[in-house]
Amino acid sequence: MKRNIDAGLLIFRLTLGILMLMHGIHKLINGVDGIKGMLAEVGLPRFLAYGVHLCETIAALLLIVGFRTRLAAVAYTGVMVVAFLMAHIDPLFALGKSGAWLHEGIALFLFGGLGLIFTGGGKYALSKNNQWD
């Protein structure tokens, strides 16, 4: 079977982008009060919740279409690092009832975004000729 890295990157971008966009749509429908509360609990300004929402929406859309993929992935990964540190750090190596790592969802988002920072969007991206692609 022939390898197609660009098709793999397209599937990867679509997966991360669509899954994150669902979080953004949820906040669009239900508001950002939950995130505001979480931010306030750890001493961060509540207005950052709007930045989280923008990232979950705008960066996700940019990943989906492949426009400035690496730049979108930087924002995406930054939000995931903060989310991991805020809500998912303790206990770090805990397993859930099914045997899965409790933090595997956020880790997939975080490391997926990190991977796209290094690879870019690939041949099937909307933009490909900029350092942020």
Which stretches of residues belong to each language-model region?
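Membrane-interface interhelical connector segments
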Residues: I29-G43, L48
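Extended, low-polarity transmembrane helix blocks
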Residues: M1-I29, F47-L54, I58-D133
